[in-house]
């Protein structure tokens, strides 16, 4: 790694990302987040790193992208480390007022994330999402396990496909929920893990709320 030298590393085992993640420490005792991905993902990870720079420039509270490159283990990125507690653990311990404030701030931050410019040549949202619906329905019909009265749900979806027409598309975080947030020691909310980012309907970025 060109500009940084680490004297200690601690693996991070939380999360579903396929990246190997470490909290690393330099000689001055400063902590960083180190992510390592397979070498064949170079182009995708390079683009992801550049998009993170764009997002950080908006003032989004997040792990700031610092360095990107290739190492013996694959493709690496170094980001600033957020001292604090995972939001999944911290938020249930807060007062209702403080929880509400975190939710409001999360929405405010997401609105900023959605302000990142999108490519002009994006496929229409209705085309993209209808294709996804069709695939899910095909898999459901091929599954030997069926819900009682499951056809009611299928009919409802088919009857409302027109709502997908003419929808705006924005830059999406892609995995926006408490598991990818952190409450810093300064009490502020920070956003983590942009490795599932995408473009699409702004409401789709709220899908992970069902996991919270």
Predicted segment positions?
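Active-site Asp-x-Gly
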Residues: 169-171, 184-212
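ATP-binding pocket architecture of kinase catalytic cores
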Residues: 11-124
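A short, local hydrophobic-aromatic micro-motif
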Residues: 7, 63-66, 192, 207
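Conserved N-terminal boundary motif of the eukaryotic protein kinase catalytic domain
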Residues: 3-11
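An alpha-helical support segment within catalytic cores of ATP-dependent transferases
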Residues: 1-2, 104, 112-174
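Conserved catalytic motifs of the protein kinase core domain
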Residues: 29, 74, 167-169, 187
């Amino acid at each position: 790694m060109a500009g940084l030298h680490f004297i200690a590393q601690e693996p991070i085992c939380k999360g579903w990302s396929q990246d190997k993640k470490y909290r690393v420490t330099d000689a001055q005792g400063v902590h960083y987040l180190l992510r390592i991905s397979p070498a064949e993902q170079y182009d995708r990870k390079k683009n992801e790193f550049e998009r993170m720079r764009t997002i950080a420039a908006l003032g989004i509270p997040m792990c700031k992208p610092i360095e990107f490159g290739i190492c013996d283990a694959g493709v690496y990125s170094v980001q600033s480390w957020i001292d604090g507690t995972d939001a999944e653990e911290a938020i249930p311990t807060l007062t209702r007022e403080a929880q509400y404030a975190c939710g409001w701030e999360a929405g405010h931050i997401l609105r900023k994330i959605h302000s990142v410019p999108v490519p002009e040549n994006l496929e229409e949202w209705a085309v993209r999402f209808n294709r996804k619906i069709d695939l899910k329905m095909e898999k459901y019909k091929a599954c030997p396990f069926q819900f009682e009265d499951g056809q009611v749900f299928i009919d409802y979806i088919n009857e409302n496909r027109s709502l997908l027409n003419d929808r705006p598309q924005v830059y999406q975080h892609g995995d926006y929920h408490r598991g990818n947030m952190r409450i810093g020691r300064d009490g502020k909310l920070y956003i983590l893990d942009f490795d599932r980012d995408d473009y699409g309907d702004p409401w789709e970025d709220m899908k992970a709320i069902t996991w919270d």
